[in-house]
C-alpha cells in the first residue's frame, strides 16, 4: 500500500507541475497566425467566425480566470464589464458582483443604486479570446475596477464534433446566451482605481 501511495503522490505532483508551469499558455498559443482581415479563421480544430466588430471603453467590474474546460483553451478569462451608469464606481460599488462558471452575478441590499433594467442592460459577462500573446499578457495585467478600451470582434466558435459557442450580438439582452464572446485584437488600460 505504501508503494501505491508514493506512486499516487508522484502522479499528483507531476500533474500539478504540468498544469501550472509546463502547460502552454492558454488562449494565445494557437492564434498567432490570426488575421483580423479575414472573416473566418481555422485554429487548432476550431473555426472562428467574426460576427461583427466590437469596441468600447468599459469598467472591469470583476474578472475570473479559467484553466479547465474546452472554453478555457480559447478564452482563459472572463471580464464582467460595465458601461454607461455601470462604469461609475458610485453605482457599481453598491452592488455585490461575482463570477462563476462563465456567468456574472450581481445583487444589492435594500434598494438598487439604479433601476434593475439599467444594471442588466449596461453590464455583461464577456468571454475574452486573446488574438495573440501580447494581447493575452495585457489582459492578464487588467484588474477589477480598471477602465479599459477593448477592440476586436464578436465571434462564433465551432469544432468538427458539432460543439458551438456563439456570442450575443445585443448589449441589452440578459440570461442564458447573453454573454459576449470577443476575439480581442487590442486592449488598453485607461485608468485604475
Label the predicted regions:
Residues 2-193:
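OB-fold and OB-like single-stranded nucleic-acid-recognition modules
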Amino acid at each position: 500500500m505504501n508503494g501505491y501511495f508514493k506512486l499516487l503522490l508522484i502522479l499528483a505532483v507531476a500533474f500539478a507541475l504540468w498544469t501550472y508551469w509546463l502547460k502552454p499558455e492558454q488562449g494565445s498559443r494557437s492564434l498567432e497566425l490570426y488575421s483580423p482581415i479575414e472573416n473566418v479563421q481555422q485554429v487548432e480544430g476550431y473555426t472562428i467566425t467574426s460576427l461583427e466588430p466590437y469596441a468600447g471603453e468599459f469598467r472591469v467590474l470583476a474578472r475570473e480566470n479559467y484553466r479547465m474546460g474546452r472554453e478555457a483553451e480559447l478564452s482563459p478569462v472572463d471580464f464582467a464589464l460595465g458601461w454607461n451608469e455601470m462604469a461609475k464606481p458610485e453605482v457599481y460599488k453598491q452592488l455585490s458582483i461575482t463570477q462563476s462558471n462563465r456567468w456574472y452575478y450581481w445583487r444589492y441590499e435594500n434598494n438598487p443604486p439604479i433601476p434593475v433594467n439599467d444594471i442588466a442592460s449596461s453590464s455583461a459577462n464577456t468571454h475574452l479570446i486573446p488574438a495573440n500573446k501580447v494581447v493575452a499578457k495585457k489582459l492578464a495585467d487588467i484588474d477589477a475596477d480598471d477602465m479599459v478600451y477593448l477592440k476586436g470582434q464578436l465571434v462564433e466558435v465551432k469544432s468538427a464534433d458539432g460543439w458551438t459557442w456563439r456570442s450575443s450580438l445585443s448589449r441589452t439582452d440578459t440570461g442564458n446566451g447573453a454573454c459576449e464572446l470577443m476575439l480581442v485584437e487590442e486592449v488598453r488600460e485607461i485608468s485604475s482605481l
